[in-house]
Amino acid sequence: MIKTAALLLATFAAASVTQPARAQAAPVAALTKSPAACPALLKHSFKRLQDEAPQDLCQYAGKVVLVVNTASYCGYTKQYEGLEKIYSKYAGRGFVVLGFPSNDFNQESSNAKEIADLCFNTYGVKFPMFATTSVKGPQANPLHTSLIKLTGQEPKWNFNKYLIGRDGKVIEYFPSKVAPEDKQLTSKIEAAL
């Protein structure tokens, strides 16, 4: 029995020496499609509405992005429904809506839980929503500061929209009165996709 065990050990040792080294598996990152380079316009991080965890906008590089300033107590608040519809319709083709609640027009709650409840439970929003921020004037967040500079259009009310192409360049600005499902907006989204 001892001779058999010794023979097995010797055979195993010889086999491990004579076996050619196996090629190491390629790293997982090499097997997955690398994301598009992050354009300057998206090189920002914002806190998420639901939990205030930071979210890097570079994860949306290579997508068509619609940036919208939102509010809970506005005549345009029902646009959440249309925003969710176009998000659902086009998300599979590389489209995302980014919602930025703002109290710049005195129509947003100061309570993040109330805003989240309205968005996620009342309107069934699935697109990314961020913590309350300023979207105009000297206090505007860095994304909106860039959008204003690039378009010459500062939000004049809630639910203003900026459409950004896959290349990270602004395609067009849309005022509040342009509803999410309006052909004026959807035709631009479809052309960008």
Summary of predicted features, one role per range:
Residues 76-140:
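Structural microenvironment flanking redox-active thiols in thiol-disulfide oxidoreductases
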Residues 16-27:
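Signal peptide processing junction and immediate N-terminal pro/mature segment
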Residues 56-75, 83, 97-100:
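Short active-site neighborhood of thiol/selenol oxidoreductases, capturing the structured segment around
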Residues 142-193:
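Thiol-/selenol-based redox modules, centered on thioredoxin-like
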Residues 26-58, 78:
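N-terminal "domain-start" segment that seeds a small globular fold
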Residues 1-4:
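Positively charged n-region of N-terminal signal peptides that target proteins for export
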Residues 6-16:
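Bacterial N-terminal signal peptides
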